Amino acid sequence: MSKLTIVRGFNDVLPLDSYKWQLLESKVKLILDRYNYSETRLPIVERSELFHRSVGESSDIVSKETYDFQDRNGDSLTLRPEGTAGCVRMVIENNLATRGQTQKLWYCGPMFRYERPQKGRYRQFYQLGVEAYGFDGIAIDLEVIAIAWSLFKELGIYEYVTLELNSLGSSLNRQEYTQALLQYLKPYHAELDEDSIKRLDKNPLRILDSKIEKTQKILANAPKLIDFIDHDLRLRFKQTCQYLDALGVRYKLNENLVRGLDYYTGLVFEWTTDKLGSQSAICAGGRYDGLVENLGGQKTAAIGFAIGMERLLLLLEDLGKLPNQDNACDVFFILDSAQLHQSLAIVENIRQELPQLKIDMDLKFGSFKSQFKKADKSGAKVAIIIGQDELDNGFAGIKFLQQNEEQQQVAFNELINFLER
């Protein structure tokens, strides 16, 4: 029988690593509470049509990266490749963005894409999503960017990341620009890289995002998207940059920054780092003011971003920003297996009264000698002995495992006071 192994592109989070996730998640919640965003929890499976209509039929994600299947009713379902489409579906279905309502939401969970696994890019990956609905003005653009900015400062990595900004204009602006770009690229068709040639028919704007040096040289003299954007949207983008200057948020303009999802309009942004090789983007987002309406809801302004949690953890590890985990318990109990009905009751009472303490014991209840060996390995400061003699006399034995002090006795009714010291 063959050995069962984990599916390629998927990862186990081992006990020694889970504390890193808990630390990061606690920082995330701290920042989002500060901005008064509410958590929502979304299903990992949605109808395939949702992603076809939102992410886009021609996008790389829908065309070749989704995990699709049919259920027993013959319905086409998809493991979510990103979170925004499902969040918008929830907002529409539960009437959360009607009659001028506003929503500030966040979620964190696994997403799935069939990509070539590499460092920082997995087939199951965790993503933090932050979304705001019903806000038209620049203030929400600044707030959403400030959330990521605050998180990176809280984590101590702000100096290692760069905010890149661009504006995609309106849908009509992009259509006009796309035609101009295609016209410009006609003479260079044979010189473009393979992926860019495919994108000519499906999503020409994605050619701007090509990492191929030869393609970038061809694009150097191409028409600029900013020249096709309406005056009011250009002014809004300029004002956004001015407000970021006032806040002290560093950024750079990237006229080739386009998002791989079809629903983005207006402002788009990425936070990137040069510490993770090719997987440089750790956060990406922008406005998608037409998406709610496109999926059957009322016309609703919307903006959001996503952070790849694995990439963020990799960056924190590479920069030495994660503290070592302290697996040591505080107290280790040495118990007589013949008297467990009494001694376990004492242990559980202490756990209830002092929930801040990490308490452990040898649940195999071997000899006292073997239990003491495990107590020494546990890292506990104190071992508490409850054997037959201790139960008969009403006193627990106290052995200090990290200090050269004599063993003491403490009455059972004083144990909690002793441990609180």
UniProtKB/Swiss-Prot annotation:
Entry's Gene Ontology cellular component terms: cytoplasm
Enzyme class: ligase
Transmembrane segments: none
InterPro entries: aa-tRNA-synth_II (IPR006195), aa-tRNA-synth_II/BPL/LPL (IPR045864), Anticodon-bd (IPR004154), Anticodon-bd_dom_sf (IPR036621), His-tRNA-ligase (IPR015807), HisRS-like_core (IPR041715), HisRS/HisZ (IPR004516)
Family: Belongs to the class-II aminoacyl-tRNA synthetase family.
EC number: 6.1.1.21
Self-association and partners: Homodimer.
Cell compartments where the protein resides: Cytoplasm
MF terms (GO), sorted A to Z: ATP binding; histidine-tRNA ligase activity
Gene3D superfamilies: Anticodon-binding domain, Bira Bifunctional Protein, Domain 2
Protein name: Histidine--tRNA ligase
Coiled coil start-end: none
Sorted UniProt keywords: Aminoacyl-tRNA synthetase, ATP-binding, Cytoplasm, Ligase, Nucleotide-binding, Protein biosynthesis
SUPFAM superfamilies noted in UniProt: Class II aaRS ABD-related, Class II aaRS and biotin synthetases
Primary localization: cytoplasm
Catalytic activity: tRNA(His) + L-histidine + ATP = L-histidyl-tRNA(His) + AMP + diphosphate + H(+)
NCBIfam families: hisS
Organism listed in the record: Francisella tularensis subsp. tularensis (strain SCHU S4 / Schu 4)
Gene Ontology biological process terms in this record: histidyl-tRNA aminoacylation
